[in-house]
Structures are given as structure tokens and as C-alpha cells.
Amino acid sequence: MNLNATLIGQLIAFALFTWFCVKFVWPPIIKAIEERQSSIANALASAEKAKQDQADSQAAVEQEILAAKEEAQKIIDLANKRRNDILEEVKTEAENLKATIIAQGHAEVEAERKRVQEELRVKVASLAIAGAEKIVGRTVDEAANNDIIDKLVAEL
């Protein structure tokens, strides 16, 4: 192999160029690459953290929705129970009122029956006395009439 000055010059130029690139060009390129790697890693970590935060938030929202549904169901159940209680109370009051009205009606009917019965006894007794007077043909005195009417009413 033949070494001449051109080859030595090229070797020196290549060595200087390599030293210059390693000393001045390579560090900024490496620094830019490392910054880019760091930026990408941070972005990926941030995205992963955001994804985890979103999943946590989604779980929290689902828990809140579930709790709200349970609370709404409790309110609905309470309202239904209250409605049933009110209906039962009204039904009981209506039954009591019905029983009271029926009892009152029976009492009124019974009182009216007794009054009519008593009135009828008095009329029957008066008619019996009148009939007896016509049959006998004479009038019994007033005191005797009242006595007879009272006895007849008591017997009827």
C-alpha cells in the first residue's frame, strides 16, 4: 500500500472533522435527542396519568350515579309507603265513618220504630176504647178511660 501526502492529509482532515463533530456537533444532537426522549416519556406518562385519572373519575361518577339511583329508589319507596299508609288511613277512617253512619242510621230507625210503635199503641188503645164505647153504648168517665188506655198500652 502506498501512503502519500494526500492520504495523510485526508486522515488528518477526517480526524479533525471527527474531533470537531464529537466535540461541537454531537453533544447538541444528543442533547436534543435526549430532550425529545424525555419529552415523549413525559407526554406518555402524562397521558397514562390522565387515562388513569379519567378511569378513576369514571368510577367515581358511576359510584355517584349508583348512589343517586339508590337514593332515588329510597325516596320512591318512601313515597309509595307513605301513599299506602295514607290510603290505609283513609280507608280505615272511611270504614269507621261508614260503621258510625250505619250505627247512627240503625239507632235512628230503632228510635223511629219505637216512637211509631208507641204512637200506634196509643191510637190502638184509643180506637179500642172508642169501639168498646160504641159496643157498650155508654161513655166511661175520663179517668177510667185514661186508666184503661194506660193498661192497654202497657199490655201492647
UniProtKB/Swiss-Prot annotation:
Q: What is this protein called?
A: ATP synthase subunit b
Q: What does this protein do?
A: F(1)F(0) ATP synthase produces ATP from ADP in the presence of a proton or sodium gradient. F-type ATPases consist of two structural domains, F(1) containing the extramembraneous catalytic core and F(0) containing the membrane proton channel, linked together by a central stalk and a peripheral stalk. During catalysis, ATP synthesis in the catalytic domain of F(1) is coupled via a rotary mechanism of the central stalk subunits to proton translocation.
Pfam (any one): ATP-synt_B
GO MF terms, alphabetically ordered: proton-transporting ATP synthase activity, rotational mechanism; proton-transporting ATPase activity, rotational mechanism
Among InterPro entries, the record links this protein to: ATP_synth_B-like_membr_sf (IPR028987), ATP_synth_b/b'su_bac/chlpt (IPR002146), ATP_synth_F0_bsu_bac (IPR005864), ATP_synthase_B_chain (IPR050059)
Highest taxon above the source species: Bacteria
Q: How does it sit in the membrane?
A: Single-pass membrane protein
Gene name in the database record: atpF
* Entry GO terms, CC: plasma membrane; proton-transporting ATP synthase complex
